[in-house]
């Protein structure tokens, strides 16, 4: 019982430092839980959002083969393979059959539904193209389409079915052909009767595979689809193909199951080809779902270059703060430890007391922190999966770290001899150990940074072609921060002594006394100084990584998409251009984009109106803007162009050089002159050529070649997403609109950047907790000094100012040094981290180091205000104590 009372008394006497321990544990548990759980949940949500955003063929995979003479056996064979190779938990598939366009019999009467005389000449000849129909058998169509009028074919009466083939026609085809319910259509060997009209619920849905015919009802001279029961496809005079279309179950996708799916897709085609009864006529795999999943998982792999950084930063700051607080606590108890040891206290007893203190204050703080972290995620990021196991593990780890570090500091102090030599009291052994540790960390940082710069990122390629996080390179940013902070900390005593000598020559107690205290009590101030340096350095590094990634991602997305909105795949480009021009607040520019040959290289030519390019494609990199000016100012005797760096290297062509552009065997060759070299040409990918479209037309005409037509549209818009939505609804000319957001990595990387900010802010919070503990320890250990100074005539207010000056000088110096350390670490690693986070960026595009200023200034400003408040409270306590009457032994 006496032992327990003594332990409680010891804890109460150092309650300020133990409160700091509890605060650090709370920060570690809360911020650590938020980082890990948010990163895990965001990875799943980001993957699902990315795959769900894929439209048409990009969100599905399809296997096609000619319909066999035994379709039932073929269907069973296909189902057996797909059920075996595709996991039902994450993928679903449907079978359908579609005919090639079927010609309508020439004798069809207009009263039967189709007016064949609309294009007839007076002499009876017909100058209109022949109308063809596409027949579709799809048992699951009712799940993704709606009836406009009538019934589905399988609901038609038996009498109707015996005479004609009942069909439901796409409403767009019905409008174009003038069809209504009850009309009949004569084919070569059968008659169709319209029993219903339908429209897709969402023509962009992956299950429709992006077919223009489904979107509009007509494409490439064919109308439809005309939905029929599958037996109606027997004996058609055209080819009929069977399709198995697979789409992912979005809510079941995880990063691991998504990676497994790509392997499942690769195995399915060979398994189908080898399956008896499937047929042998042209099995093919179509669709972009594997590429979509690969792009999404590549983005998640890229995020792995950043996700360890906030945890490492938080852990380093937390461990440093707890270690320094343990040292501070052991140093403050040095006298009582010597006394207890002299009276027979065992080392394990002293260690057990301090470990128990750490557990007693740390466990409630860890539970509270983990709960706060989970609650914050539920409020700020609802709908994401959460894991209580993560919260429990982080809370337990935080308490364990606190217990181990405080127990280690107590063990180190208790193991010191009771009777100590001058060398023991001087701390030379401790300083030597600290110097050795600093050297070891510096060596580790140098090796890690070398590995990091060698690979260009923390990610490395594995033998199977995937990516993995290099365990040494990923430590580089934090090890650089630690090494520089430890080096700065090792130098601060010498700087403090120098400043003390300078200040001692000046009259007055301030600033001589504060600087002398900093020099003489350097180990005690090290707890707050080191964690403050690390926290400030971490926030500067975070701002550099965040700003550099944002700029690099924006540049890469602009180069990938070109315009703010890019319209591609139009079967009728004129209709797409007309629809785009009718939208409000848009600038539309047609773009020629085609493959050409430049010397030995295959390149992509992008030709558009350069005078409008800044309007349709704002935010392009500066070198592209400069290239536009160079092209416009160049001599027009030869076609002026800009080429990218890779093409320049491959052809040994630079500004002013003459090159030949081979447009194709039918379009001839034109001569051009290089006006500028850019890192990458917008919309071209690698090996790009940029030219003005009007000048290209003039050069082609002069060469006697065929003028190239525009392949796509670039649109500048006040609201790009509204333009994309309009194209999704109308699908003019079968076109697909893509915004820059589709090429951005923000949906996957932004949560990791948020986690990085959380880690840096957590490091600052740990530093603030260490400062509060330092202020409390100084207040309890230097009461006698306050009385002595008062007896010597030092006013209470001056003593308060001296204490404020001590803390302000220590923390202010740490902030300045931390900012410098963060700048050095950012210079060494931020650009590589930004590149690693944008895996699809052109290799020639160099990331620039840019600071995200507003969060940086807000975080540093809040930290400076908080530290100033702590210093003011500590100074106020000294002022009150120095001005209180009475003797110390009475108080």
Which stretches of residues belong to each language-model region?
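Membrane transport/envelope proteins' first extracytoplasmic loop
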Residues: 1-318, 328, 456-474, 487, ...
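N-terminal Sec/SRP start-transfer signal
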Residues: 1-32, 423-441, 490-538, 783, ...
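Interfacial "coupling" helices/loops that link adjacent transmembrane helices in transporter permeases
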Residues: 14, 320-359, 422-424, 769-812
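Alpha-helical transmembrane segments of multi-pass membrane proteins
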Residues: 16, 348, 352-365, 369, ...
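Alpha-helical transmembrane segments
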Residues: 312-319, 384-405, 469-486
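Hydrophobic alpha-helical transmembrane segments that constitute the membrane-spanning cores
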Residues: 313, 357-381, 762-772, 809-830, ...
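Juxtamembrane segments of multi-pass membrane proteins
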Residues: 456-646
């Amino acid at each position: 019982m006496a032992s327990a009372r003594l332990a409680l008394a010891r804890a109460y006497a150092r309650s300020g430092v133990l409160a700091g321990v509890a605060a650090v544990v709370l920060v570690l548990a809360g911020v650590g839980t938020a980082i890990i759980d948010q990163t895990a949940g965001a990875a799943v949500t980001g993957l699902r959002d990315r795959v769900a955003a894929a439209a048409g063929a990009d969100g599905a995979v399809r296997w096609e083969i000619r319909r066999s003479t035994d379709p039932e056996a073929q269907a069973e064979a296909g189902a057996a393979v797909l059920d075996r190779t595709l996991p039902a938990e994450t993928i679903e598939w449907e079978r359908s059959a579609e005919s090639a366009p079927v010609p309508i019999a020439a004798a069809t009467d207009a009263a039967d539904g189709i007016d064949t005389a609309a294009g007839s000449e007076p002499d009876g000849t017909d100058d209109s193209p022949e109308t063809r129909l596409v027949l579709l058998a799809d048992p699951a169509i009712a799940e993704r389409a709606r009836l406009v009028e009538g019934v589905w074919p399988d609901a038609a009466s038996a009498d109707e079915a015996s005479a004609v083939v009942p069909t439901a026609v796409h409403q767009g085809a019905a409008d174009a052909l003038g069809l209504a319910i009850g009309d009949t259509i004569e084919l070569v060997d059968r008659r169709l009767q319209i029993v219903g009209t339908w429209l897709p619920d969402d023509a962009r849905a992956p299950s429709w595979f992006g077919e223009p015919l489904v979107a509009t009802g007509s494409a490439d001279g064919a109308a439809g689809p005309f939905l029929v029961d599958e037996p109606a496809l027997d004996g058609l005079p055209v080819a009929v193909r069977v399709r198995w279309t697979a789409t992912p179950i979005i809510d079941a996708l995880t990063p691991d199951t998504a990676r497994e799916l790509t392997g499942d897709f690769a195995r399915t085609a060979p398994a189908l080809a080898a399956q008896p009864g499937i047929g042998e006529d042209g099995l093919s795999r179509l669709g972009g779902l594997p590429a979509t999943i690969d792009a999404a998982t590549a983005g998640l792999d890229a995020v792995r270059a950043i996700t360890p950084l906030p945890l490492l930063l938080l852990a380093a700051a937390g461990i440093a703060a707890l270690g320094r607080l343990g040292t501070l606590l052991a140093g403050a108890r040095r006298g009582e430890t010597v006394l207890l040891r002299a009276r027979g206290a065992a080392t394990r007893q002293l260690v057990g007391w301090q470990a128990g203190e750490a557990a007693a204050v740390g466990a409630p703080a860890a539970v509270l922190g983990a709960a706060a972290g989970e609650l914050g995620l539920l409020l700020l990021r609802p709908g994401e999966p959460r894991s209580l196991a993560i919260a429990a593990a982080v809370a337990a780890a935080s308490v364990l770290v606190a217990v181990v570090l405080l127990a280690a500091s107590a063990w180190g102090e208790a193991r010191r001899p009771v009777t100590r030599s001058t060398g023991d009291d001087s701390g030379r052994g401790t300083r030597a150990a600290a110097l050795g540790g600093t050297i070891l960390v510096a060596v580790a940082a140098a090796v890690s940074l070398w590995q990091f710069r060698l690979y260009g990122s923390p990610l490395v390629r594995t033998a199977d072609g995937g990516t993995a996080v290099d365990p040494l390179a990923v430590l580089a940013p934090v090890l650089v921060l630690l090494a520089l902070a430890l080096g700065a900390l090792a130098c601060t005593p010498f700087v403090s002594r120098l400043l003390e000598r300078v200040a001692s020559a000046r009259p007055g107690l301030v600033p001589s006394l504060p600087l002398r205290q900093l020099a003489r009590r350097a180990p005690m101030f090290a707890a707050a100084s080191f964690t403050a340096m690390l926290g400030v350095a971490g926030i500067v590094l975070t701002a550099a990584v965040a700003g550099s990634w944002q700029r690099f991602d924006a540049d890469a997305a602009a180069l990938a998409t070109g315009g703010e909105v890019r319209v591609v795949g139009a079967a009728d480009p004129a209709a797409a251009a007309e629809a785009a021009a009718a939208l409000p607040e848009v600038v539309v520019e047609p773009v020629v984009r085609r493959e050409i040959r430049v010397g030995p290289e295959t390149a992509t030519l992008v030709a558009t109106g350069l005078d409008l390019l800044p309007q349709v494609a704002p935010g392009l990199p500066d070198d592209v803007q400069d290239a536009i000016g160079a092209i416009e100012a160049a001599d027009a005797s030869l076609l002026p162009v800009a080429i990218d760096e890779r093409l320049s290297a491959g052809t040994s062509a630079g500004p002013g050089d003459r090159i030949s552009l081979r447009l194709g065997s039918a379009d001839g060759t034109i001569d051009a002159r290089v006006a500028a070299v850019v890192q990458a040409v917008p919309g071209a990918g690698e090996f790009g050529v940029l030219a003005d479209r009007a000048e290209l037309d003039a050069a082609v005409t002069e060469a006697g070649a065929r003028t190239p037509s525009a392949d796509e549209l670039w649109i500048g818009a006040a609201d790009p997403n509204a333009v994309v939505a309009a194209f999704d609804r109308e699908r003019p000319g079968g076109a697909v609109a893509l915004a820059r957001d589709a090429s951005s990595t923000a949906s996957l990387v932004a949560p990791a950047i948020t986690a990085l900010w959380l880690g840096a802010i957590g490091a600052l919070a740990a530093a603030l907790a260490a400062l509060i503990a330092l202020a409390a320890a100084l207040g309890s250990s230097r009461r006698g000094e306050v009385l002595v100074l008062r007896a010597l005539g030092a006013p209470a207010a001056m003593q308060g100012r001296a204490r404020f000056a001590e803390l302000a000088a220590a923390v202010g110096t740490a902030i300045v040094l931390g900012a410098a350390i963060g700048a050095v670490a950012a210079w060494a690693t931020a650009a590589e981290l930004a590149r690693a986070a944008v895996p699809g960026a052109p290799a020639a595009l160099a990331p620039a180091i840019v600071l995200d200023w507003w969060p940086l200034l807000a975080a540093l400003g809040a930290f400076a205000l908080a530290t100033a408040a702590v210093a003011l409270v500590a100074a106020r306590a000294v002022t009150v104590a120095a001005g209180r009457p009475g003797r110390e032994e009475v108080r």
